[in-house]
Structures are given as C-alpha cells and as structure tokens.
C-alpha cells in the first residue's frame, strides 16, 4: 500500500463499498419494491447486523483521532471516512476519556481518576457504571461487555441504528 493508510482501514472501506454495491445490485436484479419489503420485514435483524458489524470492525464516529494531532502524529491514522473534528472537544476530551477511565476503576460508581476526590460517575452522561440502574442506559452495555474500544463502537452504532429505527417506526405510525 503506497499511502499512509493501514491495510485494515482499506479493507473496511472496501467492505462498506461492497455492501452498498451489493444492495444496489440486488435492487436492480429483484426490483426495488420486493427488496424494500424484505428490508422492512427484517429491519430489526438488519439493524442488529449493522451494530454487530460496527462492533466487530471497531467502527465509531468518534473524533478521538484528534489526540494524534495534539500529540504530533498523523491525524488520519485508522480513520475510515471523514476527518476527526477539532470542534468535538466535548466528545474526545471529556466524554470518551470519562467512559474509558471507567474500565480502570472496574466500572465503579465512584471514580477517583478525575479531580482530587472520588466523583459520582453515574451522573455523567457518557460514563458506564456497573450498577443495577445501568439497565436503563443500554448504550453503555457495550463498554461493560466488550471493553473500551469496542464499547465505543457499540455506543456510536447502537445509538444511530436505534434512532433510525425509531424514526422509521414513527413515520410508519403517522403515515
């Protein structure tokens, strides 16, 4: 590979393009309506498959690659599409480090890695906590089940898929 991009990133790009072309090809071969009806019937399985693929391939929409910029490294390392955004400091300086720090404290309710005294981590939107109340924050389950990196992929992909499916269901109800 002549560019600075890694082979895994190129493989992920290839797979994403291949899947898009496969969907278009199937729609051309079988017709848009039958494929659309099949996708409608299997929308939850397709959504779960998208989440599983993102977790397995470790794909997230995080701008955590900005840390490479601040540390003087190539910012595009391991970026599949787009560029890390400097404006997203709320995510890559605050939210994601708080979520990742929880793995070092065993996902405890209080974490003393930030500040001079233990902080209540359940009150933080992005911090997973190993507690019964975490049942009501399902997007954090990925951190607890899969660890920090794949948990971040689950956090991003599950929120997007659930938002899309909820909007789809809403439009089905009002139409």
Q: What does each model-found stretch correspond to?
A:
Residues 8-65, 69-71:
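Start-transfer (signal-anchor) and selected internal transmembrane alpha helices
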Residues 3, 19-27, 163-166, 170, ...:
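N-terminal targeting leaders only when they are immediately followed by extended low-complexity/repeat-rich tracts
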Residues 1-7:
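Short, strongly hydrophobic alpha-helical membrane anchors
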Residues 67-175:
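Active-site lumenal/periplasmic loops and adjacent helix-entry segments of GT-C-fold
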């Amino acid at each position: 590979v002549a560019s600075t991009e890694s082979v895994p990133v190129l493989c992920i790009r290839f797979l994403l393009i291949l899947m898009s072309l496969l969907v278009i090809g199937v729609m051309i071969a079988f017709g848009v309506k039958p494929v659309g009806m099949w996708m409608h019937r299997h929308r939850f399985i397709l959504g779960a498959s998208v989440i599983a693929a993102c977790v397995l391939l470790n794909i997230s929409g995080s701008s955590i690659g900005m840390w490479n910029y601040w540390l003087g490294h190539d910012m595009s390392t391991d970026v599949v599409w787009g560029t890390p955004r400097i404006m997203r400091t709320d995510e890559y300086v605050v939210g994601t480090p708080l979520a990742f720090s929880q793995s070092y404290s065993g996902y405890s309710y209080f974490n003393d890695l930030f500040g001079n005294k233990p902080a209540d981590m359940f009150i933080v939107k992005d911090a997973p906590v190993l507690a019964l109340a975490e049942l009501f924050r399902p997007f954090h389950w990925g951190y607890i089940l899969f660890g920090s990196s794949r948990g971040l992929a689950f956090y991003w992909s599950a929120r997007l898929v659930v938002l899309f499916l909820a909007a789809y269901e809403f439009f089905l109800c009002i139409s």
